[in-house]
Amino acid sequence: LPEEFDEKKKLIFYCKRGGNRSNSFHTVCGNIGWNCSVISGGYKSYRKFVIERTKKLSLSREFIIISGRTGNGKTRILNSLELNGLQVIDLEGLACHRGSILGGVIDTPQPTQKQFESNIFETLRKFQSNEIIFVESESRKIGRLTIPEHFFSSIYNSKLIKIENYSNHRVNFLIKEYSNFMEDHRAIFDLVNLLRKRISKENILDIEKYIADRDFKKLASELLSLHYDKSYDNSMFKRKGKLIKQFNFNCEVEDAVDYVCRYVIDNNIHKRETF
């Protein structure tokens, strides 16, 4: 125990309902001299608190969605905004998943659903109410995890910043972004199998040939045109949020990312009173 706990500032113990198990352990550790406490009502009480507070925070905060077809560097934009001190929730990061059929390439396994919800709450609670929170356009499912209902409802019809770029630039970006994955042919074949019900047999044969030939440009281009772009366009058709800015680029995605971030910061888009 000393090896695990000595460096901790404060220990918080809990069991399912906050009964004898956690209280007994708290007594022992307190007698040792550790600074510790018990969650009243146990984990069940904590879960109720997380759900209720997430709902309240979701309704009281204002969000802007960074939207755009796959390969526009939306996650890069969020990361850059966060590095510049803006409020960002990287849902894909919290879910340890890239939110697409290639999402499983991240080595870290996805958290449990309850841990994912706690991650969202812990991120939300630290934000200032007078500033916008930036999120990426997502479906409600990220891998095997589901975005909490009230949080998803709050962001679904939020204001939008839309990024457009030519497909050749998006293809180049995806090849660089997934460079390690592109070398793992077995993983590619496994994931492409998930598309068999969504695209034709002829297209699947073409994709398999591109993989075998290591023609990653054609592979990425085909995946965009056959699946990703259509999926994004369908999802955007259902959204009712106000479009506050659309960027139409014909440049490297990295340059577009820098431009969008600079625009947001220079124009104080992150301040709630701006709109």
Residue ranges and their predicted role:
Residues 12, 37, 64-66, 87-89, ...:
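Hydrophobic/aromatic beta-strand patches that form the interior of the parallel beta-sheet core
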Residues 34-48, 90-95:
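A short glycine-rich beta-strand->turn/loop micro-motif centered on a GG-aromatic cluster
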Residues 154-159, 164-275:
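Conserved NTP phosphate-binding and transfer environment spanning the P-loop NTPase/kinase superfamily
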Residues 40-66:
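Glycine-rich adenosyl-nucleotide cofactor-binding module
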Residues 20-21, 62-83:
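Glycine-rich phosphate-binding P-loop
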Residues 83-154:
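Conserved nucleotide-sensing/catalytic segment adjacent to the nucleotide-binding pocket
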Residues 1-10, 48-53, 185:
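Helix-loop module immediately N-terminal to the HCX5R catalytic loop
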Residues 1-40:
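Catalytic cysteine-centered active loop of the rhodanese-like fold, especially the PTP/DSP P-loop
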